[in-house]
Each structure stands twice: as C-alpha cells, then as structure tokens.
Amino acid sequence: MSDAYKLLVLAGDGIGPEVMREVARIVHWMSAHRGLKLEITEELVGAASLAVHGVPIRDEVIELARQSDAVLFGSVGDPAWSHVGFDKRPEVAILKLRKELELFANLRPAKLFDALIDASALKPEVVRGLDLMIVRETVGGIYFGEPRGIETLPDGSRRGINTEVYTTSEIERVARVAFDLARKRDNRVCSVEKCNVMESGLLWKEVVTDVHKREYPDVQLSHMLADNCAMQLVRDPNQFDVIVTGNLFGDILSDLASMLTGSLGMLPSATLGPVRADGKRNALYEPIHGSAPDIAGKGIANPLAQILSFAMLLRYSLNRAEDADLIEMAVSNVLASGLRTGDIMSPGMARVGTEMMGQAVLREMEKLA
C-alpha cells in the first residue's frame, strides 16, 4: 500500500467513537467506489488512553501523527478525570498534538446549509448563502507573549500583564495559508487587526500587504479593524470569503461566525502546520464540539461535524476536492430531506440518531456518485 495515504484516526472520548464510526462507513465506501486508498491507524487518546496507558497521549502516537498525511481527531474530555493534575487531564492530548506537530493555522469554516437557515441567529435574507473561512494564527499573539503574569505593586494593588507579540515570519506563514485557500475559493482575503492602536497590528497589516504584493497579486486583499469586522459579520456576513487574523481576534471572531450557522454540532475545523520536507503539511482535522459525555453511548450525537471534518481532510490534505464536494452535497441533501439529530431539531422535521444520520449521508452519496 505504498501509494496509499496514511491516516491516523484518534476517536477519543465521549461521543468521539460514535461519530467516528459513521466516518468509517464513508471511508469504506469511498475505498470501494472512489478509488480512495487509505492506510489507517487507530490509536487511543484522552481518557481512553489514560485508562489503558496512564497518559493522555503516548509519544508513539505523536510520532505516528508526524508520519501521517493527516490526523482525524474526535474529541477528548471526561469528568471522571477532573480531579487529577493538569498534565493527566484528557484534554492534554489535543494540546500536546498541536504543539508537537507545530500546528499554527486554524481553519474554521462557517457555511450555512439552506435547510438550517431558520436556526441561524440572523434573518434569512442576511445569512442566506453564507460560506466563509476564518484563518486564525494559533501560536503567537497575546496568549503566548512575554512578559506575562500577575504582580503585586508597592502600594499593595495587583497588576495583570499580557503581551501581544508577533514576528514577521509568524505573520507571513499564516498569510500564505489564507491566500492559498482563497485561490481555491472566491479569491478574496480580508486581513483583520487593530493597526490604529496596536503596533503588532500595524506590523501585521504591513507584512500581509507585502506577502500579497510579492506572491499573491492575483488575490483580492482588503484590510479591516477587528471591532468593525465583528460588526460586519453580523450586518453582512456574505461580504467575506477568507478572513485571516491573529490569535485573540481569531478566537473571538470564529466563535461569533459559528453561531451564524445555527449549530456547533455542524461545524468542522482544521489546524495546519508548516510545510514538511516531503512537501506536505502536518494537519489535524476535528469537529469543534466537545466530547459531550452527557449523551455519550445514547446514539443521539450529531455525526455531521465529524463527517464534514473528513471532507475538509480530503480537500486540504489529500487534494481530493471532488470527494469533499460529494460529502458536502450529500449532507446538504440529507438536511433538505428533513432529517435532524436532536441538536438541530425543529418543528416538522424527522428526528434520527447518530447511526441513521450517518447512513442517510452514505445513501445520498451513493445516489450522487
């Protein structure tokens, strides 16, 4: 299987294994009918790994991730482990993976399926047709800058300190990710910062402008202040194609954009690393929802975010855009038929569980293929 793509599957905890099973059905079908060759390795992470190996993620799993074409991640988290030290928490698995793989660019799509338009927080006429991508830089900025901390002043009062720091290279590489994505979409990038009050924002704007001029003159570039961007996302979200921004603003804006779609259970994500010696990027794909231990094992979890995360993997790591389109169209058609899991249920629709939703997507793929 030397010509097969290497895929590491980490289902994790809670509903992770349940929703990942529905992806496995799709993978099996695509292997049989679409010529998709995958060499799949499955490993334990999170609480599942703690129970067997005593650690949230083993070093061997991280090495497997480095050698893979992509990592498909479920979710981690289990309240049964809330009493242990931080380094033993299930959530450490995903944090360590992101660090060891040097993942720096988080891709958060906000795409509204027509059938869910009434679930959006905005009026249908404002949000119809929504399809934007937020690219968030995740290793720099105020979350990691030094100095930081809380100190006691001579008068006894306390002061909290955080420092916003960005370097040219950090900005350049995330800008390239955004411009490359735009070329595969509607060819538009909006760079977001606060250059009017922050020197780091001024550098951000200058560097993005320079990368655009030197390497991507064919892509349409605009600039917007972060506070204005938040307002514009609510006023007219369809003006955006790709938004690229720093860690703090990306954290806020991507959560805002997620609610334009109506349900966190529908949203996939990707996080990309630098280009490796073999020309590929380390990449991890995961739904943005958590492990949902309260519904784990009940067969009612929404598998669509996990399925759509696999579609992103096909598109961005395996360069199989047609296969990704097939999955996304199948999901759209299933929703249009009226099938809903509980988290996206609305009057007049038909409630189904995890397995039935996954099977419906697969049947629709068979019709479309």
From Swiss-Prot:
Binding residues for NAD(+): G290, S291, A292, P293, D294, I295, A296, G297, K298, G299, I300, A301, N302
GO molecular function: 3-isopropylmalate dehydrogenase activity; magnesium ion binding; NAD binding
Keywords for the protein's UniProt record, in alphabetical order: Amino-acid biosynthesis, Branched-chain amino acid biosynthesis, Cytoplasm, Leucine biosynthesis, Magnesium, Manganese, Metal-binding, NAD, Oxidoreductase
Cofactor(s) required for function per UniProt: Mg(2+); Mn(2+)
Any Pfam family the entry gives: Iso_dh
Binding site for substrate: R98, R108, R136, D227
EC number: 1.1.1.85
Main location as per UniProt: cytoplasm
Transmembrane feature ranges: none
InterPro entries documented for this protein: IsoCit/isopropylmalate_DH_CS, IsoPropMal-DH-like_dom, Isopropylmalate_DH
Residues of the site described as Important for catalysis: Y143, K194
Subunit structure: Homodimer.
HAMAP family assigned: LeuB_type1
Family assignment from sequence similarity: Belongs to the isocitrate and isopropylmalate dehydrogenases family. LeuB type 1 subfamily.
PANTHER family registered for this protein in UniProt: 3-ISOPROPYLMALATE DEHYDROGENASE
Protein name: 3-isopropylmalate dehydrogenase
Gene that produces this protein: leuB
